[in-house]
């Protein structure tokens, strides 16, 4: 029997990272939900306000809007730019409460003398003259982009879920060992006796161990970053050495400021590495690379270097906050060194409908996004989810989810680790 969306049957989302939460927002924005208001439950091991955990990368990574749409991929370019426009307007309206900050972004390229054409569509785009290029840099551009503070952004998603559902969406902290456990009394006591109409599996690395999924193609890509406090730096910098390859190739060094004065420095890509603690030698390497692309991180350089420009609501320095004086100034700025596991997958993202559970519950997979969370949240997955929704009987689901509404809650973000 094909699953149907009887409005009395719950929809269950497994996972409460940025993928799971944005999936919930999408469902709540749908015409079907507004008409029928089926129960929606989120079941997760980790929640946004939990202590930092390498397996829950959503709150650890640096994040910014930085498209990697190929020049020939016109559709993805349109999605990414529309997302930027919506997010930029959110920042203009809400300021730091949005979890976003507009800033000048500088992209440095080593070993190549061109850039993605989508950068030229951003405000304030310019190509840096050769005379202004740092040592060993072959090409550079700058433009206005957006940085995100994940904890603030995720908190806003949680508030949206509550608001859109009139506090009817239930979030349960529960370790689900296997999909068949959804019929266990300990779960039915939470979600009701009716079997779920649909289960959305947004578990990231959890897909490796979740019974009934056990996807052996899932693996961690370890990322280490350094969080410092340097509120005088309000511009973002990225250096790409080698082929970009969709944002995951070569070596990338980045400096991502946040609205609260923190800065994320990174990063690393270590496939299959489960070590959850920072490595001291990696921290030193990140600091060295970050200083190469942004000397203003070191307060001593502020005497001879101009302050990074800002497009933000906040001043560069708070009234009572001055650059510290210290023998090792970068060491004095460090808040923490952090490790997170990108939920990577051989073969790429799994976004598809699988076999029904017990012949009565539709199963939709949405995991394996690695560091490219934005591709998980843009227009292409929307269309796939709509396709699955129609097969499930979500008639008219898209009627209430136009492009503007969808992108306003599900942005194109690049999570950096």
Curated annotation (Swiss-Prot):
GO cellular component, one term: cytoplasm
Binding site for FAD: 19, 57-58, 62, 342, 373
InterPro entries in alphabetical order: DAO, FAD-dep_OxRdtase
EC class name: oxidoreductase
Any one biological process term the GO annotation gives: D-amino acid catabolic process
Keywords for the protein's UniProt record, in alphabetical order: FAD, Flavoprotein, Oxidoreductase
GO molecular function, a single term: D-aspartate oxidase activity
Organism: Cryptococcus deuterogattii (strain R265) (Cryptococcus gattii VGII (strain R265))
Official protein name in the record: D-aspartate oxidase
Function: Selectively catalyzes the oxidative deamination of acidic amino acids. Protects the organism from the toxicity of D-amino acids. Enables the organism to utilize D-amino acids as a source of nutrients. Enables the organism to utilize D-aspartate as a source of nitrogen and may also contribute to utilization of D-tryptophan, D-tyrosine and D-asparagine as a nitrogen source. May play a role in its interaction with the host.
Recorded catalytic activity of this chain's protein: D-aspartate + O2 + H2O = oxaloacetate + H2O2 + NH4(+)
Enzyme Commission designation: 1.4.3.1
Domain of life, per lineage: Eukaryota
């Amino acid at each position: 029997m094909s699953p149907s969306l009887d409005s009395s049957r719950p929809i269950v989302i497994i996972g409460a990272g940025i993928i799971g939460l944005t999936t919930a927002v999408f469902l709540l924005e749908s015409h079907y939900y507004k008409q029928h208001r089926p129960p929606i439950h989120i079941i997760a091991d980790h929640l946004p306000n939990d202590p930092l955990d390498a397996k829950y990368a959503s709150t650890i990574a640096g994040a910014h809007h930085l498209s990697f749409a190929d020049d020939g991929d016109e559709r993805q370019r349109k999605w990414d730019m529309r997302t930027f426009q919506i997010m930029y307007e959110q920042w203009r309206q809400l300021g730091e409460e949005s979890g976003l900050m507009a800033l000048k972004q500088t992209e440095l390229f080593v070993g190549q003398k061109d850039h993605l054409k989508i950068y030229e569509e951003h405000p304030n785009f310019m190509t840096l003259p050769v005379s202004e290029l740092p040592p060993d840099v072959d090409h550079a551009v700058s433009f206005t982009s957006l940085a995100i503070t994940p904890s603030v952004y995720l908190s806003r998603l949680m508030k949206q879920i509550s608001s859109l559902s009139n506090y009817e969406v239930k979030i349960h902290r529960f370790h689900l060992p296997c999909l068949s456990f959804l019929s266990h009394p300990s779960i039915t006591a939470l979600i009701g006796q009716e079997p779920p109409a649909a289960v959305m599996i947004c578990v990231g690395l959890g897909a490796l161990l979740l019974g009934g999924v056990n996807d052996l193609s899932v693996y961690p890509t370890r990322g280490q970053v350094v969080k410092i406090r340097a509120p005088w730096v309000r511009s973002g910098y990225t250096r790409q050495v080698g082929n970009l390859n969709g944002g995951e190739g070569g070596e990338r060094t980045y400096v991502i400021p946040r609205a609260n004065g923190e800065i994320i420095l990174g990063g690393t890509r270590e496939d299959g590495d489960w070590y959850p603690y920072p490595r001291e030698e990696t921290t030193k390497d990140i600091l060295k690379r970050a200083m190469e692309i942004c000397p203003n991180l070191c307060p001593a350089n502020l005497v001879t270097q101009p302050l990074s420009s800002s497009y933000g609501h906040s001043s560069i320095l708070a009234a009572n906050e001055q650059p510290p004086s210290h023998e090792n100034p970068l060491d004095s700025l460090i808040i923490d060194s952090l490790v997170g596991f990108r939920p990577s997958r051989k073969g790429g993202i799994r976004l598809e409908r699988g076999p029904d559970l017990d012949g009565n519950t539709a199963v939709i997979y949405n995991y394996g996004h690695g560091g490219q969370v934005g591709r998980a949240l843009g227009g292409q997955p929307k269309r796939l989810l709509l396709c699955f929704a129609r097969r499930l009987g979500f008639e008219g689901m898209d009627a209430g989810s136009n492009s503007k509404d969808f992108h306003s809650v599900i942005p194109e973000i690049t999570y950096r680790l």
